[in-house]
């Protein structure tokens, strides 16, 4: 259920046939190597969206959010996700975008696309109108969640503010190692859980390969303070 652009699968661990760029395949979040034209020189200020377990970045000219331990960006009619604020980014298929991301009110999109025009600012985008009948049938309850049952917002990974410029880790493996040491949060959303599990499996496989080689050779509240 991933729309994949030259992406192998979650961190290259789950080896399955790829979908073309025009196909929606539902398996989670793609391998994080996609460049989406966002280059953040430093950790952004994030503010809670009232009533939702989501943060947004009011000072960025981008549709940039944080939810359940990951950053989410909506750009050019696609969703992208990353565990680090400046990527690399993985493509998220429309069938896999978490409900609480889909429900973010229009007013929190800092760079809304033209087709948002005329939509209520205090309501979620009309994804069914935009993405069509088939999508709406598959995600028929996306806008019916009980906000009272919403999980608490995930803690922000504020440790990442110490990694900017040349200090920013570019390799996914390095990012995961730092995250394991600095951020103990466990996600609840199935798509995010799958991504986290893929990271852990990839790390374990990498260590096993290294050992094998060794043997063979011998508007809300500001939460950034």
Regions found by a protein language model. Give the residues of each.
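Low-complexity segments
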Residues: 23-192
């Amino acid at each position: 259920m991933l729309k994949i652009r030259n992406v192998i699968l979650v961190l290259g661990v789950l080896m399955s046939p790829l979908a073309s760029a025009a196909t929606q395949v539902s398996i989670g979040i793609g391998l994080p190597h996609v460049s989406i034209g966002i280059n953040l020189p430093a950790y952004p200020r994030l503010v809670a969206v009232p009533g939702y377990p989501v943060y947004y970045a009011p000072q960025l000219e981008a549709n940039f959010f944080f939810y359940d331990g990951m950053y989410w960006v909506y750009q050019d009619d696609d969703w992208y996700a990353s565990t680090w604020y400046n990527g690399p980014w993985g493509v998220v298929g429309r069938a896999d975008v978490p409900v609480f991301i889909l429900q973010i009110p229009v007013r929190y999109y800092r760079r809304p696309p033209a087709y948002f025009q005329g939509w209520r600012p205090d309501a979620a985008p009309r994804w069914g109108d935009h993405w069509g009948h088939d999508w709406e049938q598959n995600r028929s309850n996306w806008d019916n969640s009980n906000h009272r049952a919403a999980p608490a917002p995930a803690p922000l990974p504020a440790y990442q503010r110490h990694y900017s410029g040349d200090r920013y880790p570019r390799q996914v493996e390095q990012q995961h190692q730092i995250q394991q040491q600095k951020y103990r949060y466990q996600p609840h959303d199935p798509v995010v859980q799958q991504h986290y599990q893929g990271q852990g499996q990839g790390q374990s496989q990498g260590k096993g390969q290294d050992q094998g080689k060794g043997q063979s050779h011998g508007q809300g509240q500001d939460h950034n303070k």
